[in-house]
From Swiss-Prot:
Disease: Leber hereditary optic neuropathy: A maternally inherited form of Leber hereditary optic neuropathy, a mitochondrial disease resulting in bilateral painless loss of central vision due to selective degeneration of the retinal ganglion cells and their axons. The disorder shows incomplete penetrance and male predominance. Cardiac conduction defects and neurological defects have also been described in some LHON patients. LHON results from primary mitochondrial DNA mutations affecting the respiratory chain complexes.
Membrane-spanning residues: 13-33, 56-76, 96-116, 123-143, 149-169, 178-198, 201-221, 247-267, 274-294, 326-346
Membrane topology of the entry: Multi-pass membrane protein
Gene symbol of the encoding locus: MT-ND2
Assigned keywords, A-Z: Alzheimer disease, Amyloidosis, Disease variant, Electron transport, Leber hereditary optic neuropathy, Leigh syndrome, Membrane, Mitochondrion, Mitochondrion inner membrane, NAD, Neurodegeneration, Primary mitochondrial disease, Respiratory chain, Translocase, Transmembrane, Transmembrane helix, Transport, Ubiquinone
EC top class named in words: translocase
Identification of the protein by name: NADH-ubiquinone oxidoreductase chain 2
Gene Ontology CC annotations of this record: mitochondrial inner membrane; mitochondrion; respiratory chain complex I
InterPro entries documented for this protein: Complex_I_Subunit_2, NADH_DH_su2_C, NADH_UbQ_OxRdtase_chain2, ND/Mrp_TM
Superkingdom classification of source: Eukaryota
Classification via Pfam families: NADH_dehy_S2_C (PF06444), Proton_antipo_M (PF00361)
Reactions mediated catalytically: a ubiquinone + NADH + 5 H(+)(in) = a ubiquinol + NAD(+) + 4 H(+)(out)
GO biological-process terms attached to the record: aerobic respiration; mitochondrial electron transport, NADH to ubiquinone; mitochondrial respiratory chain complex I assembly; proton motive force-driven mitochondrial ATP synthesis; reactive oxygen species metabolic process; response to hypoxia
E.C. numbers: 7.1.1.2
Amino acid sequence: MNPLAQPVIYSTIFAGTLITALSSHWFFTWVGLEMNMLAFIPVLTKKMNPRSTEAAIKYFLTQATASMILLMAILFNNMLSGQWTMTNTTNQYSSLMIMMAMAMKLGMAPFHFWVPEVTQGTPLTSGLLLLTWQKLAPISIMYQISPSLNVSLLLTLSILSIMAGSWGGLNQTQLRKILAYSSITHMGWMMAVLPYNPNMTILNLTIYIILTTTAFLLLNLNSSTTTLLLSRTWNKLTWLTPLIPSTLLSLGGLPPLTGFLPKWAIIEEFTKNNSLIIPTIMATITLLNLYFYLRLIYSTSITLLPMSNNVKMKWQFEHTKPTPFLPTLIALTTLLLPISPFMLMIL
């Protein structure tokens, strides 16, 4: 990517997300989504090769299809109600079409097939933006129209997403695909609680972004893209050996780490609404995520690649990449649970 074009591209992505998140008019919301989508394609093709080009085409086709469905739903709602305001989305069919479009943009099941492929075909930094920043605009739309959502359909999509994300990651060896399937599972949890408590979705999204950002930065620091390459962590960067497992366990939602907080709060929210079966199913299926996280932890902390003695301590002399935000992110990833009563009180 041309260095001169980078500020324009990233500022357009930021502006598109901001327009969508702050707008209450359907037309400007759609324009913001389109700005965001078109500006993000060069980010996916940062390294020009056939795999990244294929990933960009898959991303464009999926997002363009979702945008067409969204535009059709907006026009249909305007024909029936004469309103462009997002809070006046009262027509049932328009609401269903908007939900389908946002499910495609978020990568929820059964529209999730593009997420692992696109994430795998891009560099780690582009994959990080795809799985974090690109979720903000669709979730802001879902947040604004949450009173008019079809609860049964949304819960069905959420459970399907949790199932697809948990089972899809079981036989993977590529770290980017594993994190993509983890993202699908987290999307299921976020959308499940949206009709009951939209603010809980925002809390879940915030913690998800912190955890995923930490995981991607650690893997990028280690230059690891497969489970086999994780085995060289001890020889290459020994100080990462305890950090990667703790981050992965937090992503899996294991107490007493930060990742347990959103799951605990969501299960409590369902219990308050006298719904016990759905959170039980969600929590049980999500346990499969812990299995493939434990596989990664095994590769990181227990398995060692065969290396000669003269390079075993090479990490002491390597010039590591600057990581100004990593200590703060690691602290938030592991130590946020004790202040959870304060956070839940705000909600």
